[in-house]
Amino acid sequence: MSAESRDVGTTTTVDRYLETIYCIAGEGEIVRPSRLAQWMGVSAPTVSDAIQRLVRDGWITIASDRSVALTEAGATKAASIVRRHRILERWLTDELGFDWAAADAEADRLSSVISDEVIDRIDASIGEPLTCPHGNAIPGRHPRYGDLIALADLEPGAAAVVRRISEVAEHEARPLLRSLAEIGIGEGSRVLVTHEAEDPGHLTIVVTGRELSLPIESAKWIRVERLGPADDPS
């Protein structure tokens, strides 16, 4: 069933909107109706109708500039939804061997039909991880990182460790998740920016001893923590 044909009052659709608002806001963006439509792949009128109902039901507020924000109840519900999704992603990748993109899609399907008790047991069985497979924190848990910057912003000669892949990439650049996994870039990977690539739209990096050319558009979704000279991965 397409997103356009669902009734916005259904639980799964409410959950989807709340999760989307949570994730966009978590990336530091202002959440506007146009951004929701872009992220979710639905029309502006569909989003407008959904926003009215979410406001009516007390899940979100809308400001004079048309930006939306979760209410306390909305934030609590959204965090619960995101927690379920990220725990399932971790289980699917770590225990069942799914790749990142497939795990994200399967977690979407499973999260609305599995009970809280099962989620809690899955969480315990995989050691209560701090993050999803892409390094995004499971709500209520706090990975200890230093300041994070985009890999695209590192200068030649800089070394860093990958901490997370932006949630934006999961929804707007899904092929990126698969390609990053294929070339060995994931949470905890150490990278060195060696020099500017001949193609101005790329940068050259070393990962696990291999030199790779990575598109800047991909590198901007990869959040890294800068390393000192003693930690140089080359």
Language-model features, listed with the residues they occupy:
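Helix-turn-helix DNA-binding elements, focusing on the entry/boundary residues of the two helices
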Residues: 33, 51, 89
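Basic amphipathic alpha-helical segments that dock to polyanions
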Residues: 17, 36, 47-57, 180, ...
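Mid-protein regulatory/catalytic core that forms ligand/cofactor-binding pockets
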Residues: 111-221
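Basic, amphipathic "hinge/linker" alpha-helix immediately C-terminal to the N-terminal HTH DNA-binding motif
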Residues: 66-85
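Extreme N-terminal segment that seeds HTH/winged-HTH DNA-binding domains in transcriptional regulators
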Residues: 1-41
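Key DNA-contact positions within bacterial/archaeal DNA-binding proteins
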Residues: 45, 101
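A short, conserved structural fragment
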Residues: 55-65
